[in-house]
Amino acid sequence: MKRVASRRLLAAVVLTACSSFLPLSAVHAETPEKPRIALVMKSLANEFFLTMEDGAKAYQKEHADRFELVSNGIKDETDTSSQIRIVEQMIVSGVDALVIAPADSKALVPVVKKALDAGIVVVNIDNRFDPQVLQAKKIGVPFVGPDNRKGARLVGEYLAKRLKVGDEVGIIEGVSTTTNAQQRTAGFKDAMDAAGMKIVSLQSGNWEIEKGNAVASAMLNEHPDLKALLAGNDSMALGAVSAVRAAGRAGQVKVVGYDNIQAIKPMLKDGRVLATADQFAAKQAVFGIQTALKLLAGQTPEHEKDGVVETPVELVTAP
C-alpha cells in the first residue's frame, strides 16, 4: 500500500506535534504497512458510544493483522469544538481513514473536507452529515448507518397501539442540529399523526439524562393530561422515567426511547419503558470500519445506494 506508506512518513514527521492534544485510546499495529483508522465518536458519557467503542476494539483485536485503531470521543453531546480539534489532530497525525459520528451534522463538514483534502478516507456513521452542506463543499462522504426515521416510526407505532385517538404526547428530541435527531422526531411524528395523537410539546433534551429529565418534568407540569413521552434516545428516556416517577404519574404516562442500551433493559422488563429501538451499537463502528477498509483497498462497499450503506434497526419491547 503506497498510500499507507506515504502517510506513515507524514505521521513520523509530525509525531512530536501531537503531544499537546487530547489523550487517545489506541491499538497499535505490529507493522507500518497496515492502515491506521481513527474512530471519532460523540459523548463517551453516553453508554451507546462506549458500547460502540468496545465493539470496534474487539473487532480490531480479531483483525489485528489488517489495521490499527485509534479511538476518541468528547465529554458531552454538544461539545462540537472539541470534536473538531480531535479530527484536526487525526489529520496531523496522518491517519489513513476517519470513521466519524459527528456531534453536529453541519459544523463538522469543513474539518472533514480538510481530511479529504489531505487524502484521508472518511466514513460517516451514526449521525449523517447534512447532504446539502456536503454538496456546497463539493465533497461526498458515505453514510453507514440505520434509517433513523424508520426505527423511530416502529417505536411510535408500537406505542400508538396502546393509546387512544386524541391522547396528548410529548417528544423529547436530541440535539436539534443533528440529522439523526431530526429523523427520529420525524419518525415519531409519522406514527403519532397516523394514529391521531395530539403532539402538545416538542423540546430538545440534548441526548442527555439530566436535560431529558428537565424537559420531561416541564412537559408533565404544563400538560397534566399527557399520556406518553417519546424520547429520541435511551439516555433521555432514563431522565423521562425519573420525571414521571417524581410527578407521581408512574403507570399513567408511557415512555419510549431509542438505542437499547443496557441501562434501559430492566425498565423494559418492568414496564417503566414501553419500547426502544436497537441499532446495534457494538456493530455500528464495525460497519464503518469495514467500509473504510474496502475504500482503502479501492473497492466499492456492498449494498451502497446514493452514498448510503444502510444497517439494521429493530423494535425492542418487553422480553
Swiss-Prot record:
InterPro entries linked to this entry: Peripla_BP_I, SBP_2_dom
Signal peptide span: 1-29
Subcellular location: Periplasm
Keyword Transit peptide listed: no
Keywords recorded for this protein, A-Z: Periplasm, Signal, Sugar transport, Transport
Annotated Gene Ontology cellular component terms: outer membrane-bounded periplasmic space
Keyword Transport among UniProt keywords: yes
A Gene Ontology BP annotation from the UniProt entry: transmembrane transport
Main localisation: periplasm
The family this protein is said to belong to: Belongs to the bacterial solute-binding protein 2 family.
Known role: Binds specifically both D-ribose and D-allose, with affinities in the lower micromolar range.
PANTHER family hit by this protein: D-ALLOSE-BINDING PERIPLASMIC PROTEIN-RELATED
Protein name: D-ribose/D-allose-binding protein
The organism's taxonomic lineage, starting at the top: Bacteria, Pseudomonadati, Pseudomonadota, Gammaproteobacteria, Pseudomonadales
Gene designation per UniProt: rbsB
